[in-house]
């Protein structure tokens, strides 16, 4: 059974708390803080939480520890890695294969609009993050991690950790966690996760643009731009729109009679 610690972390009764460092970092724009976490910790971030259309996508990344023999190579290969929002699309696409090659494990979780509307975006984000952990697979540096070792610690971007009951239900794991505000800019594994989540989701939205033409998904990726909202007013919502979102409802209202036949 999980227990709350004085740091506000969720730790299992099996002694996982012993893996935690004595002092956990807060957001620090000076640079990555990965060395303050247990070896083989998992960095987690999401993309698309605030969008009006498309799924919310999360990624999880485990990088080799700072003292690993491959560390100098990783530092060079991932030079300039930071919050995906601060990187150009070209740079993100260059970093994506490098991250997968340098990672011990990486995974992606996707939750679609119908589920978002049913359980709300926050719960959907928790589920996407949990799915990313469940889908962790071997990366290019898989051999550096002991075989069969489960995730030992989750560093989650933002101000909230994944509720223990959600993580347990999706992954079967009870793992200590910490939420780090601005973690995508100061923890390399979270930065890597932010890039994988963003590139994966952008690719999905570009593909969806071909199926649901007229909305401009390939351009705005589902965010609430003026052009996107105008397209919803003109065409009505499609199956990729989040009907529970406040900005979608007014634009979709004139098409309410067509809601049962979303294309």
Curated annotation (Swiss-Prot):
Its cofactor is Mn(2+); Mg(2+). Gene3D superfamilies: Ribonuclease H-like superfamily/Ribonuclease H (3.30.420.10). Residues 39-257 form the RNase H type-2 domain. InterPro entries: RNase_HII (IPR022898), RNase_HII/HIII (IPR001352), RNase_HII/HIII_dom (IPR024567), RNaseH-like_sf (IPR012337), RNaseH_sf (IPR036397). A divalent metal cation binds at residues 45-46, 157. It comes from the Bacteria. Coiled coil: none annotated. It is found in: Cytoplasm. It catalyses: Endonucleolytic cleavage to 5'-phosphomonoester. Keywords: Cytoplasm, Endonuclease, Hydrolase, Manganese, Metal-binding, Nuclease. GO terms for molecular function: manganese ion binding; RNA binding; RNA-DNA hybrid ribonuclease activity. GO terms for biological process: DNA replication, removal of RNA primer; mismatch repair. Its EC number is 3.1.26.4. The keyword Ubl conjugation does not apply. Transmembrane segments: none annotated. Manganese or magnesium. Binds 1 divalent metal ion per monomer in the absence of substrate. May bind a second metal ion after substrate binding. The keyword Manganese applies. One of its GO terms (cellular component) is cytoplasm. HAMAP family: RNase_HII_B (MF_00052_B). Endonuclease that specifically degrades the RNA of RNA-DNA hybrids. Belongs to the RNase HII family. This is Ribonuclease HII. It comes from Oleidesulfovibrio alaskensis (strain ATCC BAA-1058 / DSM 17464 / G20) (Desulfovibrio alaskensis).
């Amino acid at each position: 059974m999980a227990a709350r610690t004085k740091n506000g972390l969720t730790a299992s009764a099996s002694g996982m708390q012993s893996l935690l460092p004595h002092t956990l970092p807060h957001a620090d724009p000076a640079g990555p803080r990965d060395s303050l976490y247990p070896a083989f910790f998992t960095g987690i971030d999401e993309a698309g939480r605030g969008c009006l259309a498309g799924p919310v996508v999360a990624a999880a990344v485990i990088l080799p520890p700072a003292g690993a023999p491959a560390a100098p190579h990783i530092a060079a290969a991932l030079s300039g890695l930071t919050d995906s929002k601060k990187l150009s699309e070209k740079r993100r696409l260059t970093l994506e294969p490098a991250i997968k090659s340098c990672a011990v494990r990486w995974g992606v979780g996707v939750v679609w609009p119908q589920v978002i509307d049913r359980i709300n975006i926050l719960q959907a984000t928790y589920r996407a993050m949990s799915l990313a952990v469940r889908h962790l697979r071997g990366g290019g540096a898989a051999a550096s991690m002991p075989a069969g070792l489960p995730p030992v610690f989750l560093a989650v971007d933002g101000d909230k950790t994944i509720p223990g009951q959600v993580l347990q239900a999706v992954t079967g794991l009870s793992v200590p966690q910490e939420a780090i505000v601005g973690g995508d800019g100061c923890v390399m594994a979270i930065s890597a996760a932010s890039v994988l989540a963003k590139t994966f989701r952008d690719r999905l939205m570009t593909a969806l643009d071909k199926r649901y033409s007229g909305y401009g998904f390939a351009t705005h990726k589902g965010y609430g731009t003026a052009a996107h909202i105008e397209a919803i007013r003109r065409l009505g919502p499609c199956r990729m729109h989040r009907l529970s979102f406040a900005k979608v409802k007014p634009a979709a209202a004139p098409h309410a009679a067509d809601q049962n036949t979303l294309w």
